[in-house]
A protein has these predicted regions:
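Helix-terminus/linker motif at the lipid-water interface of multi-pass membrane proteins
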Residues: 41, 45-64, 133-140, 196-203, ...
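N-terminal transmembrane alpha-helices
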Residues: 20-57, 71-86, 90, 115-122, ...
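Short alpha-helical transmembrane segments in multi-pass integral membrane proteins
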Residues: 1-33, 91-158, 200-256, 312-379, ...
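Interfacial/gating helices of multi-pass transporter permease domains
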Residues: 54-74, 141-145, 205-206, 247-254, ...
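Small-residue-rich hydrophobic transmembrane alpha-helices
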Residues: 63-123, 160-179, 286-350, 383-405
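Hydrophobic transmembrane alpha-helices of multi-pass small-molecule transporters
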Residues: 75-78, 122, 190-194, 220-224, ...
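Short runs within selected transmembrane alpha-helices of multi-pass transporters and secretion channels
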Residues: 84, 152-171, 179-187, 208-223, ...
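Transmembrane helical elements of multi-pass membrane transporters/channels
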Residues: 31-50, 152, 163, 186, ...
Length: 483
């Protein structure tokens, strides 16, 4: 632990806080995004290790149970990650504008707000968990396992909320390396606890869930201890802890759309999961394994999205709209290249990826999973463009548009589910995500230019820190694309 603290101190020196309003754009974005990307992948490692351990150590039914629980648990994680990411945009904006007093009040108010949200999520999850799984027609042979796994994760929601808020506060200052370090430590601990609880102790899916919660809690404690000693921006006075309704509203204006966006996958996948459950536990297992590749791509793109939103927020605070536009162009090129590489990996090595979760004797599950992976991976490039544009709009305060686009994703996935999955079976699952990516990316592309012009006009009219637009801009956009 002493070595970890020493390394954290080195990573957290003031030079590690990134001022994204100056310097090379690509270098700045990549330096900021890479630690977040690795962190996102390690965060996803929690669920992937749970899935792999129960799949290979317990059996296909346990794999299907964790898979059936995945949309519900991802809804929890997406809500908390999105909300805390949105709060970090507010903090980054005041950091970029040099308003230290308001920045500290924003940190304190955000902590109170996310704590209340974490408690509410825990209570709601504990009360509604079984009813939700029954509502989406979870097969009887995996129902108890899915409920048990999800309920334990809901009980650990406060720890998850605490870690993600602490990490995103540091990221708002440009320090993404220290949160990554603590997340890696906790992820490796999760691997060890998973192996211990599932194999020697035989706790099954419950053991995998308990390992995840304990690991998240340790990650939160490590991060908080480091911040208390080494991050001067969070040394708050008692007066900073006074509830500020205006700042809470700002947090919600950015946090709710990002939470909604981060939860969209889970919300729309709940619709898809209901149809998938009707196909039986074998198809649930195939989808659970194959869709992990999609999830990894989402996490990589989310890292670029977080970097772009922070880049846009800091530069909006300093009045540099031109730099934001150039950053979006360059980041788009980077994500296209990265997504092309991920597509090649899925096409060439998909079978080896599937074998992490199921044995070679499960030939039917392997075949279905490979068909799914080879179909969806073709359009990963579209997904990358989508994330860059959407998060750039959030970074400059145009959060209503991403929410509108998110609703289109839910509608598209629901349509594909009822038009294809219920008619042609598992093959229809492979078209649901690509259809969402295409429709939402078209909408993002249409909205980007007028929304950036609106941000520039608002910047000229008033200080950037004073105004965040609302849904009236959506109406104005519909009336004539005149913003």
């Amino acid at each position: 632990m002493q070595h970890i603290s020493s390394l954290a101190r080195k990573l957290g020196e003031p030079s590690k806080s990134v001022d994204m309003t100056q310097g090379g754009i690509c270098r700045t974005i990549l330096a900021f995004a890479l630690p977040i990307m690795i962190g996102n992948l390690f965060q996803q490692l929690y669920n992937m290790v749970d899935t792999a351990v129960v799949g290979r150590g317990v059996g296909p039914e346990a794999l299907a149970a964790v898979g059936a629980a995945s949309p519900v648990t991802q809804l929890l994680l997406g809500l908390l990650i999105g909300m805390t990411s949105g709060m970090s945009v507010v903090i980054a904006r005041y950091f970029g504008a040099g308003d230290e007093a308001r920045m500290k009040r924003a940190i304190a108010t955000g902590a109170l707000l996310i704590g209340a949200i974490g408690i509410a999520v825990t209570v709601a999850g504990a009360l509604l968990c079984r009813a939700l799984f029954e509502f989406i027609h979870t097969p009887e042979d995996i129902l108890d396992g899915a409920v048990e796994y999800a309920a334990i994760l809901f009980l650990g929601a406060v720890a998850t909320a605490a870690y993600n808020y602490e990490a995103n506060v540091m990221r708002a200052f440009g320090n993404s390396a220290v949160p990554l370090l603590f997340l890696i430590v906790a992820s490796l601990l999760n691997v060890g606890l998973d192996l211990l609880f599932v194999f020697p102790l035989g706790w099954g899916v419950a053991g995998a869930a308990i390992a995840t919660v304990l690991s998240q809690l340790i990650s939160a404690i490590l991060c908080l201890a480091y911040m208390a000693r080494r991050v001067p921006q969070v040394r708050l006075a008692r007066s900073d802890w006074k509830w500020d309704g205006a700042l809470a509203a700002e947090h919600l204006r950015t946090g709710v759309p990002m939470a909604f966006f981060s939860s969209l996958l889970a919300i729309s996948f709940l619709i898809l999961q209901s149809a998938l459950n009707s196909l039986g536990s074998a198809d649930v297992a195939a989808y659970t394994a194959a869709s992990k590749m999609d999830t990894l791509v989402y996490q990589v793109m989310a890292a670029f999205g977080t970097a772009v939103s922070t880049f846009a927020a800091q530069n909006y605070g300093s009045g540099s709209i031109g730099r934001i536009r150039e950053g979006v162009r360059r980041c788009t090129g980077i994500t296209v290249a990265v997504c092309a590489g991920l597509t090649a990996f899925a096409q060439l090595f998909g079978r080896f990826f599937m074998l992490l979760f199921v044995g070679p004797e499960d030939a039917g599950i392997l075949a279905s999973g490979m068909m799914y992976m080879r179909t969806t991976s073709v359009l990963y490039v579209v997904l990358g463009f989508n994330y860059v544009i959407r998060f750039a709009l959030i970074g400059v305060g145009k959060s209503a548009i991403p929410m509108l686009v998110g609703l289109s994703e839910i509608a598209t996935r629901a349509a594909v589910t009822y038009l294809l999955v219920y008619r042609i079976g598992f093959a229809g699952m492979a078209f649901a995500s690509p259809a969402c990516w295409v429709t939402s990316t078209i909408l993002c592309g249409l909205c980007y230019a007028p929304m950036m012009r609106s941000a520039e006009d608002r910047l000229r009219a008033a200080p950037a820190a004073s105004a965040w637009p609302g849904f009236r801009e959506v109406i104005a956009l519909w009336k004539g694309w005149s913003l």
